[in-house]
Amino acid sequence: MATGKIVQIIGAVIDVEFPQDAVPKVYDALKVESGLTLEVQQQLGGGLVRCIALGTSDGLKRGLKVENTGNPIQVPVGTKTLGRIMNVLGEPIDEKGPIGEEARWDIHRAAPSYEEQSNSTELLETGIKVIDLICPFAKGGKVGLFGGAGVGKTVNMMELIRNIAIEHSGYSVFAGVGERTREGNDFYHEMTDSNVLDKVSLVYGQMNEPPGNRLRVALTGLTMAEKFRDEGRDVLFFVDNIYRYTLAGTEVSALLGRMPSAVGYQPTLAEEMGVLQERITSTKTGSITSVQAVYVPADDLTDPSPATTFAHLDSTVVLSRNIASLGIYPAVDPLDSTSRQLDPLVVGEEHYNVARGVQGTLQRYKELKDIIAILGMDELSEDDKLVVARARKIERFLSQPFFVAEVFTGSQGKYVSLKDTIRGFKGILEGEFDHIPEQAFYMAGSIDEVVERASKM
């Protein structure tokens, strides 16, 4: 292959000069003689290409030889990647020796054509009450976990992986995009302790890595998930955190000298998001169900990054700081969270009516809060007092102990089937449990546990 030499280094951006007749294509991977991999981002003319470094550019100097590999970055795919931790280039970083893969795929691939895509309305039960009731997941759908800092996005995601791996025994791919190394480490040990590590491929590009790594690591993970899908499996693809993918794009964009757009984001924000999201789709052979954590800067859902992500999702799970401050975990906001699946034709009349009933009761309670704050409970009508009492029970019953949080809570995690969830909330709405004190509903699993607790009070 053609060889060139480094002519300029500005941080993570490196210009390489090649002979005029052998200029690499955009997205080709180049290898520096020091072992560093570069990815071509722009052709500047005159044999010059501008690249982004996928690793630290410390110690590089002008004149170093660079070889063109002739294709994009290629990463290992297939069952050999399960139980392993890899970096953006697919190299193992868990000190367990080589991956031993049978195939390598390019990380830049076309999305499946419209004819190949399939649309399923089958529900994926998560065992988390508030999600199964209010914003049910579709098998092969896209889910976003929206929340500010510290409201529980990663814990929710870990619980979902644990529940789905154990209850549905499917394969998962986890892409850690610009997250804390500590979380990556915790996550690995959590998967080991739950005995589900052999069903998960882990790909990490953490916070301390250069922007090129963080920008491409989501594509590395997605490529591995696509391989499982094309083998006819139903695979789960977890991204933590999609906001850092956008942020890495912003850094790269600035380094490449592009003019920023709104709030300083890259002008290509919507396109970059589309390139990733369009590939996360289900085909007639298999499905990819994706769960993406979305950090919301300053809790502002209208920020361009979360706003662009919203457009691609089937279900949005919004985590609220107000609910977390009440000590109700998972801190999902039942009035803000939505799902395209919550339709009587998909989930059935009973589920739909119970979910809307729960939202209606909580909405009414929200409206009455101002009156209660000014005049007190005694000024409410009997009907409104009943609404408030039931809403407070619903609020508490939406909380649930998690398996992955047993270390912190000291209580046993609970998996609640959809049938039990609907039965419990239907009972509360119909006044079946009006005699039970509200504290019995807090951090309980199914309604049977609540009744049992109340009998001991």
Swiss-Prot record:
GO terms under cellular component: plasma membrane; proton-transporting ATP synthase complex
InterPro entries, sorted: AAA+_ATPase (IPR003593), ATP-synt_VA_C (IPR055190), ATP_synth_F1_bsu (IPR005722), ATPase_a/bsu_AS (IPR020003), ATPase_alpha/beta_chains (IPR050053), ATPase_F1/V1/A1_a/bsu_N (IPR004100), ATPase_F1/V1/A1_a/bsu_N_sf (IPR036121), ATPase_F1/V1/A1_a/bsu_nucl-bd (IPR000194)
Top class in the EC scheme: translocase
Protein name (record): ATP synthase subunit beta
Sequence similarity: Belongs to the ATPase alpha/beta chains family.
GO molecular function list: ATP binding; ATP hydrolysis activity; proton-transporting ATP synthase activity, rotational mechanism
Keywords linked to the UniProt accession: ATP synthesis, ATP-binding, Cell inner membrane, Cell membrane, CF(1), Hydrogen ion transport, Ion transport, Membrane, Nucleotide-binding, Translocase, Transport
Entry EC number(s): 7.1.2.2
Residues bound to ATP: 147-154
Intracellular or extracellular location(s): Cell inner membrane
Membrane-related topology note: Peripheral membrane protein
Reaction equations catalysed: ATP + H2O + 4 H(+)(in) = ADP + phosphate + 5 H(+)(out)
Phylogenetic classification of the source organism: Bacteria, Pseudomonadati, Pseudomonadota, Gammaproteobacteria, Pasteurellales
Assembly and binders: F-type ATPases have 2 components, CF(1) - the catalytic core - and CF(0) - the membrane proton channel. CF(1) has five subunits: alpha(3), beta(3), gamma(1), delta(1), epsilon(1). CF(0) has three main subunits: a(1), b(2) and c(9-12). The alpha and beta chains form an alternating ring which encloses part of the gamma chain. CF(1) is attached to CF(0) by a central stalk formed by the gamma and epsilon chains, while a peripheral stalk is formed by the delta and b chains.
